[in-house]
From Swiss-Prot:
The activity is thought to be regulated mainly by the availability of decarboxylated S-adenosylmethionine. The active site is at D173. Residues 18-253 form the PABS domain. It catalyses: S-adenosyl 3-(methylsulfanyl)propylamine + putrescine = S-methyl-5'-thioadenosine + spermidine + H(+). This is Spermidine synthase. Keywords: Acetylation, Polyamine biosynthesis, Spermidine biosynthesis, Transferase. It comes from Mus musculus. Putrescine binds at Y79, D173, S174, S175, D176, Y241. Belongs to the spermidine/spermine synthase family.
Length: 302
């Protein structure tokens, strides 16, 4: 393993042993994901979390927060494109967008591609994640240079309390429900987002994995249905997330919203112009087709 620009690679963080990074977590017990490391690029502890970046043998640069992979250059586009386009293409005219989290810049990159979007506010509590991403994940962080962006380094909770009835779409790109991020999976957080949305507003949040967190997803869906007239759940595949999948919880204040049929259908020319690699209108529809065990658990009987 080569030395990196921020110092020698050895001994490196504890998660890297004999040239391999190994991800383990109490949220997915009994399983692990390993990636071969070519070079340790960055390892520091910010005010909020441990930040690690390494160049992998087959997945490009990898961002790890508190020992958990957040994104890799090879497969990040599937998650970023879906969490952004599922809500944006379900809204007839999304002009004002709020992003909570997403310090790597990937969601922002996708949001600003939409011509209808006039302004984006992003709230990221950890400025170090933004700076590290600009340095080591430039293909994701490119959105930070957009003239549509107002960047707020601080607490998204407090920001939304002060900005009610303000946004057409809110996207929460959170880490897993541990530590500070745990509050982003609670009913009180969804209630706060509801007040920050305009009367026909839509939200989309990282919704964990159906293979690992079905009870949590069911709980979230239950309280969301008490807050919003329209609630749905979708998912996509992404190799370096736990069990190779990640889900999305979508809610709308507009009773006529149908998440399963995009109101904005992209032509092939638009897909190519937006440089999309995963999302298209057919993939949008397919994302809501759940396997039988998930459909039953969520009582998703149409």
């Amino acid at each position: 393993m080569e030395p990196g620009p921020d110092g020698p690679a050895a001994p490196g963080p504890a998660a890297i042993r004999e040239g391999w990074f190994r991800e383990t977590c109490s949220l997915w017990p009994g399983q692990a994901l390993s990636l071969q490391v070519e070079q340790l690029l960055h390892h520091r502890r910010s005010r909020y979390q441990d930040i690690l970046v390494f160049r992998s043998k087959t997945y490009g640069n990898v961002l790890v927060l508190d020992g958990v992979i957040q994104c890799t250059e090879r497969d990040e586009f599937s998650y970023q494109e879906m969490i952004a386009n599922l809500p944006l293409c379900s809204h007839p005219n999304p002009r004002k967008v709020l992003i909570i989290g997403g310090g790597d810049g990937g969601v922002l990159r996708e949001v600003v591609k939409h011509p209808s979007v006039e302004s984006v506010v992003q709230c990221e509590i950890d400025e170090d994640v933004i700076e590290v991403s600009k340095k080591f994940l430039p293909g994701m962080a490119v959105g930070f240079s957009s003239s549509k962006l107002t960047l707020h380094v601080g607490d998204g909770f407090e920001f939304m309390k002060q900005n009610q009835d303000a946004f057409d779409v809110i996207i929460t790109d959170s880490s897993d429900p541990m530590g500070p991020a745990e509050s982003l999976f609670k009913e009180s957080y969804y209630q706060l987002m509801k007040t920050a949305l305009k009367e026909d507003g839509i939200l989309c949040c990282q919704g964990e994995c159906q293979w690992l967190h079905l009870d949590l997803i069911k709980e979230m869906r239950h309280f969301c249905k008490s807050l919003f007239p329209v609630v749905d759940y979708a998912y996509c595949s992404i190799p370096t997330y736990p069990s190779g999948q990640i889900g999305f919880m979508l809610c709308s204040k507009n009773p006529s919203t149908n998440f399963r049929e995009p109101v904005q259908q992209l032509t092939q020319a638009q897909v190519e112009q937006m440089q999309l690699k995963y999302y298209n209108s057919d993939m949008h529809r397919a994302a809501f087709v759940l396997p039988e065990f998930t459909r039953k658990a969520l009582n998703d009987i149409s």
